[in-house]
């Protein structure tokens, strides 16, 4: 292109993906990203924490969605004058990596890992977690997401891991880390416990599962002397028959009423409220032999269903449990303390220790010989058979199986390997979250959440019920728990280390690798053992991977060993974003560690977006192929199209989003193409590059500049509160006004090379591309560089508030003009009256018709009507229909809400000057009622948006109007013919037209109209044998003069 001309653009639809690749190549060669950071050296910093993804798989739509937000916000903040570092990170430890390696190597259990050697296995994990880094970098780059890959951090790095063990040592020193024996969610496939928050991260952790449910009678022995229960059966219900061999007690609620009933030759005890549920087994009206409060049953002894642990101290008695209800079951709960959290708490209180006959693989051990070696889920069937037949191990104590059914219920599954979990008592290390839970709730109030309801809803409620966090994992690839214990219980000692220096001090060697097995090789004599025979050895567990990622703010910079001042100035972070499930994951662990270590929140602002679903509304699945291939979308529609589709959706306000190819293409149609076509239109018709100007007096120029000023303010407001969908909607609406109103209404001015129009559109596009740059970084880069010839739109500042002239009255008036035209056009379309057919009259009824008075001619021209009449008599053509919003008003008004509804339905509602509604005995506020303007004659009348008024279209068609419409149809066809023959818009032509006899009068009447519109300096009628057929039997020939 020359210095005074816009680039020559290819005709037709743009190849947006190809243009995007050119931009990406330019950015790479120009090092534009680095320049954007360097340009802000010395500026205030905006701290963005980029949550680390796992790199042992390819990115999916969820990653892309979050990645776009992680790009938009830093771009915007950079344009607002901040320096925003964007350091990428990798989450490398934990089960995700281990399971991938197990799959690659054909490993099915931990014994095979031990056989191959921990060193070899962890080497394979290290290679696996970095396997897809190149692919990740390619995807992120194709997104047009700017991140610093060269200075990335990895949770497997020695410096990062040292900061993590420092954090653990800090918790230990504060008394917030301890070893305990608890019932935890346990994955028998991976042979490790999970923390409770991991069960609440994803909706699909709980999957529908069918399990056997049994109701079993346990025989009472030696009952209280006066309660008459000896020989009766306590009915218990359970969906885990495999736990019955470990039964040590049953629980009742002290406040529930229980009954002893006679059924056949047996007596059964259950909650009175559950009698009807067991009518089939106990009879419709069983004989009630006694009624008891639950408190009266406490201490009652019984025979367990299996006789494996008959001598267990304090076992086999009725205990009190506040968790017992009559919602289901029998009101009496079977307790196996090793496999139930509540069970263990209640049992421990009376001195009942748990029995643990299930090994780390979920199989019964030798203590229950009849089921030894069977997996607990597989053993269910045999256990039920033995109870039913009272054979085998169930024969001794004579339990009675009175019901066996299949029970379908949501059941927790491992979030990594997807196998059903069990609950199992294990020794684990914990963070004592319950000690500072209240402080976490307090600090949460300092965080700004989007959506706002997450603060006191999903996140806040989770914090209120937070339990101690199990942080140890019986695995291999992870940050080691830095705890060394004496191997001789006679000389107990625990040492906890928080740095490489401390390890070197005690072990005489500075670790070059903190991973297993090398860290396990560090041993030393126990200083507390005078015999010198015991050794300090590291416990074999590694830390929960969420402890790694929760340490990201300080571990990424090796705090506190380096960068102390930097960390203090960059903590807490200004902004983080992930999907809503991270309220139980990364958001949560960040908050736990920040509260415990620093007594501060880890982040100031958090966006928790919804979930991306496949086009069938289900979770995305590779096997179902229920989502468009990411690469194909990039290749066909481009990254900006995908970015717009995801960012403009409700998903960033907490809703879920179904991904469809049509939805992505709609973004191209609604915004990308209109922006490009406007730029292309300017480049085509402007004789030279426009000049920055905001002083045109033409009403359309003044309007679009003032409208742009509103866009600047609206986008600023939305982006400041992280409302990216709102920002997208503002941009979409402005693009609509720019292309379908300003440019279309100004075409003749551009064809005439009007300098005011050209300079105004140049100015508008220059500002618009800057405003849209964070949302659409690729297409705006192309347009902006074409307009300005400068380096990059992403090296510019956000437009200042005083950059553009404001005119709120003009914007309001012209927007109402557009609404009027839109409503009237819809009426015309409904009547099937073509656009070029003139109509006699349009009535516009609005509250302030004087506002529209200057635009009457514009409205008439736009709508092709001969007369536009303005009036304020809205009630002549429609009425306001009032309805009470009972959901909002009900809680305040109580019973008066029904009287208000009745009054409004009877037409007795009156809107007061202050906007309140008087309805019967009640006065309703503006949000407690709805007002809708309804047209009296819907066939000819339409309401304007927000009840601003009505338009009434007279669709009467006279012969004169039909003739003029016929002429305008021919004008359109002739303009298309000019275009197809390659004529420039300014070329004058000679026209010969052949018209059927029945249309000759119409043609001659409107000859001058036709000739003027198509720039015909010579126009004649004649018979043509070989002219071009256009419409309605007309043939023409044209030639340039």
From Swiss-Prot:
EC number: 6.1.1.5
Cofactor(s) demanded: Zn(2+)
Keyword NAD: no
Residue ranges annotated as motif 'HIGH' region: 53-63
PROSITE patterns reported for this sequence: AA_TRNA_LIGASE_I
Chief location of this protein within or outside the cell: cytoplasm
Molecular-function GO terms, alphabetical: aminoacyl-tRNA deacylase activity; ATP binding; isoleucine-tRNA ligase activity; tRNA binding; zinc ion binding
Alphabetical list of SUPFAM superfamilies matching this protein: Anticodon-binding domain of a subclass of class I aminoacyl-tRNA synthetases, Nucleotidylyl transferase, ValRS/IleRS/LeuRS editing domain
Protein's job: Catalyzes the attachment of isoleucine to tRNA(Ile). As IleRS can inadvertently accommodate and process structurally similar amino acids such as valine, to avoid such errors it has two additional distinct tRNA(Ile)-dependent editing activities. One activity is designated as 'pretransfer' editing and involves the hydrolysis of activated Val-AMP. The other activity is designated 'posttransfer' editing and involves deacylation of mischarged Val-tRNA(Ile).
UniProt family annotation: Belongs to the class-I aminoacyl-tRNA synthetase family. IleS type 2 subfamily.
Listed name of the protein: Isoleucine--tRNA ligase
Organism phylogeny: Bacteria, Bacillati, Actinomycetota, Actinomycetes, Mycobacteriales
Gene: ileS
């Amino acid at each position: 292109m020359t210095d005074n001309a816009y680039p020559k653009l290819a005709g037709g639809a743009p190849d947006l993906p190809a243009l995007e690749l050119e931009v990406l190549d330019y950015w790479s060669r120009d090092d534009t990203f680095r320049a954007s950071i360097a340009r802000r050296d010395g500026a205030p910093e905006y701290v963005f924490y980029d949550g680390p993804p796992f790199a042992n798989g390819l990115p999916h739509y969820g990653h892309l969605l979050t990645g776009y937000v992680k790009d938009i916000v830093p771009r915007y903040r950079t344009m607002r004058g901040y320096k925003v570092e964007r350091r990428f990170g990798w989450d490398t430890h934990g089960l995700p990596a281990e399971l991938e390696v197990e799959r690659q190597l054909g490993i099915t259990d931990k014994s095979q890992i031990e056989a191959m050697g921990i060193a070899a296995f962890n080497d394979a994990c290290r290679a696996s977690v970095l396997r897809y880094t190149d692919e990740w970098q390619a995807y992120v780059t194709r997104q047009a997401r700017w991140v610093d890959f060269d200075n990335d951090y990895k949770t497997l790095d020695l410096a990062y891991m040292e900061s993590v063990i420092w954090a653990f040592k800090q918790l230990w020193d504060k008394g917030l880390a301890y070893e305990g024996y608890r019932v935890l969610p346990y994955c028998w496939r991976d042979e490790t416990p999970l923390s409770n928050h991991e069960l609440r991260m994803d909706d699909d952790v709980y999957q529908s599962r069918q399990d056997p449910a049994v109701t079993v009678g346990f025989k009472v022995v030696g009952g209280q002397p006066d309660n008459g229960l000896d020989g009766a059966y306590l009915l218990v219900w359970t969906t885990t028959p495999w736990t019955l061999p470990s039964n040590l007690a049953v629980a009742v609620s002290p406040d529930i009423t229980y009954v002893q009933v006679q059924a056949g030759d047996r007596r059964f005890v259950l909650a009175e409220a559950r009698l009807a549920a067991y009518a089939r087994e106990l009879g419709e009206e069983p004989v009630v032999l006694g009624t008891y409060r639950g408190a009266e049953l406490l201490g009652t002894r019984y025979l367990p269903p299996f006789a494996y642990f008959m001598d267990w101290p304090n076992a086999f008695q009725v205990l009190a449990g506040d968790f017992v209800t009559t919602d289901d079951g029998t009101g009496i709960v079977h307790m196996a303390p090793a496999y139930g959290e509540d069970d263990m708490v209640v049992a421990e209180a009376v001195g009942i220790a748990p029995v643990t006959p299930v090994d780390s693989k979920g199989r019964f051990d030798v203590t229950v010989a009849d089921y030894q070696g069977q997996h607990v889920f597989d053993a269910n069937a045999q256990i039920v058979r033995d109870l039913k037949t009272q054979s085998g191990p169930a024969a001794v104590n004579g339990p009675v199986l009175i019901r066996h059914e299949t029970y379908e219920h949501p059941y927790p599954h491992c979030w990594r390997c997807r196998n059903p979990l069990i609950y199992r008592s294990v020794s684990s290390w914990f963070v004592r979250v319950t000690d500072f839970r209240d402080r976490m709730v307090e600090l949460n109030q300092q965080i700004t959440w989007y959506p706002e309801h997450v603060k006191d809803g999903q996140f806040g409620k989770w914090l209120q019920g937070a339990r101690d966090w199990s942080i140890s994992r019986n695995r291999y690839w992870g940050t080691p728990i830095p705890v060394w214990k004496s191997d001789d219980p006679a000389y107990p000692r625990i040492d906890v280390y928080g740095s490489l220096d401390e390890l070197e001090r005690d072990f005489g060697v500075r670790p070059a690798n903190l991973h297993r097995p090398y860290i396990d090789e560090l041993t030393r004599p126990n200083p507390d053992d005078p015999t010198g025979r015991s050794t300090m050895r590291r416990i074999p567990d590694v830390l929960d991977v969420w402890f790694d990622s929760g340490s990201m703010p300080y571990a990424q910079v090796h705090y506190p060993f380096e960068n102390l001042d930097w960390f203090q100035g960059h903590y807490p972070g200004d902004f983080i974003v992930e999907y809503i499930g991270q309220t139980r994951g990364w958001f949560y662990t960040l908050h736990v560690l920040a509260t415990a270590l620093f007594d501060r929140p880890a982040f100031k602002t958090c966006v928790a977006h919804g979930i991306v679903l496949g086009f069938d509304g289900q979770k995305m699945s590779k096997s179902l192929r229920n989502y468009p291939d990411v690469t194909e979308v990039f290749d066909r529609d481009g990254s900006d199209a995908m970015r717009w589709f995801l960012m403009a959706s409700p998903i960033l306000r907490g809703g879920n989003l179904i991904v469809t190819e049509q939805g992505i293409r709609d973004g191209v149609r609604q915004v990308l193409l209109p922006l490009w076509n406007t730029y292309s239109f300017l480049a085509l018709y402007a004789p030279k590059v426009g000049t920055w100007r905001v002083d045109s007096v033409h009403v359309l120029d003044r309007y679009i500049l003032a409208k742009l000023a509103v866009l600047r303010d609206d986008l600023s407001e939305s982006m400041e509160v992280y409302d990216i969908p709102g920002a997208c909607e503002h941009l979409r609406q402005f693009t609509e006004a720019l292309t379908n109103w300003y440019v279309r209404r100004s075409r003749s001015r551009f064809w005439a090379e009007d300098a005011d129009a050209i300079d105004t559109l140049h100015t508008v596009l220059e500002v618009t591309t800057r405003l849209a740059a964070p949302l659409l970084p690729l297409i705006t880069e192309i347009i902006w560089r074409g307009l300005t010839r400068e380096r990059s739109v992403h090296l510019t500042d956000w437009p200042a508030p005083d950059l553009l002239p404001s005119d709120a009255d003009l914007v309001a008036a012209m927007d109402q003009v557009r609404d009027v035209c839109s409503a009237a056009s819809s009426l015309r379309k409904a009547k099937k009256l073509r656009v070029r057919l003139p109509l006699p009259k349009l009535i516009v009824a609005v509250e302030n018709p004087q506002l529209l008075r200057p635009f009457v001619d514009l409205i008439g021209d736009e709508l092709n009507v001969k007369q536009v009449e303005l009036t304020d008599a809205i009630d002549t053509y429609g009425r306001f229909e009032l309805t009470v919003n009972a959901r909002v008003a009900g809680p305040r008004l109580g019973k008066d809400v029904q009287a208000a509804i009745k009054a409004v339905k009877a037409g007795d509602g009156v809107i007061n000057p202050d906007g309140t509604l008087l309805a019967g005995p009640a006065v309703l506020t503006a949000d407690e009622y709805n007002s809708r303007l309804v047209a009296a004659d819907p066939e000819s009348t339409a309401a304007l948006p927000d009840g601003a008024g009505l338009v009434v279209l007279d669709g009467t068609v006279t012969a004169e109007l039909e003739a003029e419409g016929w002429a305008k149809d021919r004008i359109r066809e002739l303009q298309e013919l000019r275009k197809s023959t390659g004529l420039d818009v300014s070329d004058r032509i000679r026209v010969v037209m052949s018209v059927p006899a029945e249309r000759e009068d119409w043609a001659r009447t409107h000859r001058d109209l036709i000739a003027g519109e198509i720039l015909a300096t010579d126009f004649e009628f004649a018979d043509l044998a070989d002219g071009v057929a256009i419409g309605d039997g007309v043939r023409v020939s044209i030639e340039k003069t």
